[in-house]
Structure formats: C-alpha cells, structure tokens
Amino acid sequence: MNVKPEEITSIIKSQIEKYEKKIETVDSGTIIQIGDGIARVYGLNGCMAGELLEFPNDVYAMALNLEQDNVGCVLLGSQEGIKEGNTVKRTGKVVEVPVGENIIGRVVNSLGHPIDGKGAISTTETRAVELVAPGVITRQAVKQPLQTGIKAIDAMIPIGRGQRELIIGDRQTGKTAIAMDTIINQKGKDVICIYVAIGQKQSTVAHIVNNLIETNAMDYTIVVSAAASESAPLQYIAPYAGCSMGEYFMNKGKDVLIVYDDLSKHAVAYRAMSLLLRRPPRREAYPGDVFYLHSRLLERAAKLSDKLGGGSLTALPIIETLAGDVTAYIPTNVISITDGQIFLETELFYSGQRPAINAGISVSRVGGNAQIKAMKQVAGTLRIDLAQYRELASFAQFGSDLDKESKRTLEKGKRLTEILKQPQYKPMAVEKQVMILFAASRNYIMDIPVERISEFEEEFLDYMDTHHREIGDEIKEKQVISDELSDKLRNAIEEFKKIFLIEG
C-alpha cells in the first residue's frame, strides 16, 4: 500500500481548520436543603433577585432570598425526584410569560401554559412578570367610563378606564358575580378582559369559564388560573403574570380590564412562602412587605398618555372579609392602594337586595369624571335620596308619626331600592340605565306599586325598544339629555304608564 505524505498532510490540515475551540461556562450551585416547595442552594454567587433557576427534571425556580452563603428559591413546579446534592444552573433570565393575541380565549396557568386542552399557544413574544409601573409623566387623568352594566355601580360608583376599584365583602355576597357581569358587559366595546383566579376551587374556575363561553365573553377574555391545589409560588406569581399579559395590550393602545379574584388568598400564599423562606413575620404573621406586594401590582393599572397610544389597564381586585370587618390588615392595605371600593353586605344580600352594594360605604374616587353627562343628569341625587331613605327608614321603624314629606321620601326610597336590583348575567346598556333612572329620579314611578316595580322596568324598556328606539339611540350617541329629549322621554313614560296601569 502506497501512502502519500501529501494526502496525510492535507487531511491533518483540514482537521485543524475545522477544529473549534469552545469553552462553555455554567454558573451552577448545589441543593443543600429542599422541602415544601422551597430550596436552598449553595453557590450561584452571581444570582439576581427574581432570577429563573434551572433544576433537574425540567423544573424551574425563582430566586427570592439572596443570603450570604446560600440562595433561597421557590419551585415553580413539582419537587418530585429532586433531592439534596442535585445541581442547579442559572439561566440569566427573570420569570417571563408568553404574551400576544393568540392567548385571548384561552385558559392558562401562572406560567402561561395552556390548561384548557386546546393545544399549544403559538406566540413568540414573552414579557417579564415583575415590571415597574408606568411613571407620573406617562399617565393621563382617568375620564373615560368603563361601563359595568350594573345600575347601582354605573350610577353611584362609576369606574373609569385605568382606575383600580376594589370589590370587598364577605364570602358568598356576589363579589365574583359583579366582576363576571362587568366582563360580559364589555362585549362589542373593544375591551380585552383578563380574569385571574387565585386559590379558587377548580370546579369554581370551570363554572366561570363555562359561563364566559355561554355568554360569548370568552372571545375577548383570558383566564389565568392558579387553583387551590397549586403551590404557593404559582399562586403568588399568578396576578403578576395576568398583569403582564394585560400590559402587552395596553402598550398597543388597547383598553384592558383585569380582575384579581382574590387578593386575600394571594396574601395568604405569599405569607406561606415567606414563612418557609424564614423571613421575619409581622402583624397577623404576614411579612413586612405585604403592602408592597399589592401596591406594586395595582400601580401597574394606568391610563397611558396619548403620546404612548392612550391604552388603559383597569383593575378590579377582590378582597374577602371576615364578618364584614374592613379594618383587618389586608383589607385596609388594599383600600388605601385603590381608587375606591364597592362594599357588599351579607345582610343586604340575604334581604334580597342584589347586587348587595352598600351605597353608604362604597365610593369611587374618580367619581363623575368617569360618567357620561346623561348619567350625571339622572343619577346626581341618587346617593342622597338613598341616604335620606335609610335614615328615615331606621327612624320610622319605631312607629313615629311621619309628616307628608317624610312619607314621600320613604316611598321614593323603596322604589329606588327596587330599581337598583338586578339579576346576575344580565348587564344593562347605559342608555337603558339612563331611561329607567330618569323615570325613578324624576318621580314618574311614584304611582306604581313597589311590588310591581321590576315588572314595570322590564316592560318599560321593551316598550321603549319597540316604540321609541330613537330616544335610546340619541342618548347613546349624544350622551346627554337635552330639554327636547327630556320632554320626549317624559311623554313616552306617561304614555307607557297609562297602558301599564290599565293592564295591571
């Protein structure tokens, strides 16, 4: 066999040319303790706060405690199969969630992974879950209304786009029902809705999703679910993940509504996590930064300036109280962060007043700025009328003789209370609200028996739809009641009353 030296030389030369010298450096550490979804890792000297760490079995964790000799982190998945001595790698990234148009209509978990059985979500963009809230210069005043479709709220506690309005009350008082009705009412209004379920039963979340599908509200809604069976870290990041998804649309100039249901369970999850991380407990065993936990989340709700596209993120956080105690630690924290609260009372709920809104304690700090002029015209005296009625009603129960004016105030109050009742999943268009509140506040329903008020309301709105559609259209278009329109509306009410009372 004849070996040519040139051939050997050329082979060696080509091999040398192809040789690539690569050194891959990995910053890794060792697990020294693991349990209850919390791990302590030795090493990782360059680790960032909130950094994503890679554990064995494709499980990730979030670094929260950066201590002198170890890093305390919370697992964002199952700790099964992970043991002390395993290697942990840094990723150099913070926790991110997928964002984009394709997430609309889907049910996802805290990490943005689909859990509705409809396959993977094709989206290329991601966004960090923890982001700094928009600054003062980047915002503008809240003045555009976000209609909830609930008469009592739109008339007395109006919500504006970019506002943070707390829904607070005991369990089973209709807090989630108000949030659901508000989402359903955004149909056709070009508002993207996000519902974040924190620590809820999976059956409850399934029921909510089914209702959203039945009312076609899922077409513009994202559901982020961190159910009660999920670990505390996943419940902790759920609202931030939902907020990041909403901010993506807000930055594109769109209007977004986000519901956090509920932040009481969120605080409990954070408390469990903090105690396991051995952070010092404070009042009610919550950590010292529990106020910051919610303030940094709710401050991300904003109405951006026109220069930045004019998008908005409206937040409806929900807080569950115990025996109506709004002076507890978490309720007072969130009340002080938000721009007002809708307070729901158990007594009102069981007396048949639904939604069970206590108009005396409930308030919107944006107020009339977030109302159309027509609503201001008809609902201006509503809160005072109801306050006078409540005061007189408590006085009248002692059987005192009342003068004519007091009796009239009582009768009007009874009718206003009936008018403000509303069944669930039946949000009302703003022009219909204006028409029925016009009839109530201007004393046109004083001769209708109290027990027939709801029947009167339903038939009156049907009558207006059939015979005087132009009145509703004008209110919707011009958003103000002119003298001419007021006369038309008055005549239509008198016309209908004759028919209604004859039939009755």
Swiss-Prot record:
Which reactions is this enzyme annotated as catalysing? ATP + H2O + 4 H(+)(in) = ADP + phosphate + 5 H(+)(out)
Keywords, A to Z? Answer: ATP synthesis, ATP-binding, Cell membrane, CF(1), Hydrogen ion transport, Ion transport, Membrane, Nucleotide-binding, Translocase, Transport
Q: Which Pfam families match?
A: ATP-synt_ab (PF00006), ATP-synt_ab_C (PF00306), ATP-synt_ab_N (PF02874)
**What is the topology of this protein in the membrane according to its UniProt annotation?**
Peripheral membrane protein
Q: Name one GO molecular function term.
A: proton-transporting ATP synthase activity, rotational mechanism
Name the site position(s) for Required for activity.
Answer: S362
Task: Report residues binding ATP.
Answer: G169, D170, R171, Q172, T173, G174, K175, T176
Tell me which EC number(s) this protein carries.
7.1.2.2
GO cellular component annotations of the record:
plasma membrane; proton-transporting ATP synthase complex
InterPro entries in UniProt: ATP_synth_asu-like_sf, ATP_synth_asu_C, ATP_synth_asu_C_sf, ATP_synth_F1_a_nt-bd_dom, ATP_synth_F1_asu, ATPase_a/bsu_AS, ATPase_F1/V1/A1_a/bsu_N, ATPase_F1/V1/A1_a/bsu_N_sf
Q: Where in the cell is it found?
A: Cell membrane
Against SUPFAM superfamilies, the record matches this protein to:
C-terminal domain of alpha and beta subunits of F1 ATP synthase, N-terminal domain of alpha and beta subunits of F1 ATP synthase, P-loop containing nucleoside triphosphate hydrolases
Major site of localization recorded for this protein: membrane
| Assembly information from the UniProt record | F-type ATPases have 2 components, CF(1) - the catalytic core - and CF(0) - the membrane proton channel. CF(1) has five subunits: alpha(3), beta(3), gamma(1), delta(1), epsilon(1). CF(0) has three main subunits: a(1), b(2) and c(9-12). The alpha and beta chains form an alternating ring which encloses part of the gamma chain. CF(1) is attached to CF(0) by a central stalk formed by the gamma and epsilon chains, while a peripheral stalk is formed by the delta and b chains.
Alphabetized HAMAP family for the sequence: ATP_synth_alpha_bact
Function (record text): Produces ATP from ADP in the presence of a proton gradient across the membrane. The alpha chain is a regulatory subunit.
Family designation: Belongs to the ATPase alpha/beta chains family.
Name the UniProt record assigns to this protein: ATP synthase subunit alpha
Q: According to the entry, what is the taxonomic lineage of the organism?
A: Bacteria, Bacillati, Bacillota, Clostridia, Eubacteriales
Gene it is expressed from: atpA
